[in-house]
Design a protein with these regions (language model features):
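Transmembrane alpha-helices and adjacent helix-loop boundaries
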Residues: 1-288
Length: 288
């Protein structure tokens, strides 16, 4: 039973991550390659406040989301006016910078040795989450809340502006909308919720190190989004299912761990290529 609950927790975390990526990528046409950087920033900031102050979860989540969102402004100030490949390169550079800092700033992050013994999250400052049941409930509730929030954004006038920007940004500018501000706000929200996923992950596994927040992780998140489908809520959920369940299915094939890890990357790549040729909008496109 604990194994199933573990899968549910990781699935919920990835649902939040892929939904967060869907906001800039699927709605505002901003292909970002730094979701894992924000995921990691949230994990490390959350770890610091958990270990130093043991804050209640609501306070901790707000601090982490605001702090991670502010970090996103560092890259959005410099990159939101860039187009296509140049924007991708800017976010890729930010991803590499964050990973390098996490790996080499050993006085703070302990580098490749990681940070062990991260405390459990406390709800309302009293009830400490212990065991997988508590984390499973929290993770599922947060994934549902984030999904409903992003659905509300999609259906709101704000979401309609974002989708219009994806189709014709110049037309939106001609109507007097500040598209740069919309992009920065979208980037802020995406980073904030990625950071939220990070603090849940850090507290749940009680150990973090930079290898959990590499460029590969960003690629997995974006791959899950494109496989599932961009521009809606169902697509990211399906993509998260694919990313989380595939490694678990490979366990039952009986392959050695080293081969299974390589097979996972090969299958991800093949699935993404096939989807791009057969169904470019993803398995569940925007109208799904």
């Amino acid at each position: 039973m604990e194994y199933i609950l573990h899968i549910i927790i990781m699935l919920s975390i990835y649902v939040i991550l892929v939904l967060s990526a869907n906001l800039p990528v699927g709605m505002a046409n901003m292909l970002t390659m730094c979701q894992a950087a924000f995921y990691g920033i949230g994990a490390y900031i959350g770890t610091f406040f958990l270990m130093q102050f043991n804050l209640p979860f609501i306070v901790l989540a707000l601090i982490v989301m605001v702090a991670t969102g502010l970090f996103s402004l560092l890259v959005s100030f410099a990159s939101v006016k860039l187009k296509d490949d140049y924007f991708i390169l800017a976010t890729l550079g930010f991803q590499m910078i964050v990973y390098t800092i996490l790996y080499n700033w050993t006085d703070v992050t302990r580098g490749p040795y990681g940070i062990p013994g991260i405390p459990s999250i406390k709800l309302f400052g009293v009830l400490s989450l212990s065991g997988v049941w508590g984390y499973a409930v929290l993770a599922v509730v947060l994934a549902v809340v984030v999904g409903l929030l992003f659905y509300a954004i999609k259906k709101s006038p704000y979401g309609r502006v974002l989708r219009a920007m994806r189709r014709d940004e110049q037309a939106v500018k001609a109507l007097g909308r500040n598209t740069t501000l919309f992009k920065m706000e979208t980037f802020f929200l995406s980073a904030a919720f990625s950071g939220l996923a990070g603090v849940i992950y850090a507290s749940y596994v009680s150990y973090i190190d930079p290898t959990s927040f590499t460029l590969d992780e960003s690629i997995f998140i974006i791959s899950a989004l494109f496989i599932g489908g961009i521009g809606n809520i169902k697509g990211p959920v399906l993509g998260a299912l694919f990313v989380v369940l595939l490694p678990e299915l490979l366990r039952f094939v009986g392959l050695p761990d080293a081969i299974a890890a390589n097979m996972r990357q090969i299958i991800y790549g093949l699935a993404l290529v096939i989807i791009m040729f057969v169904r470019p909008q993803g398995l569940l496109g925007e109208k799904a």
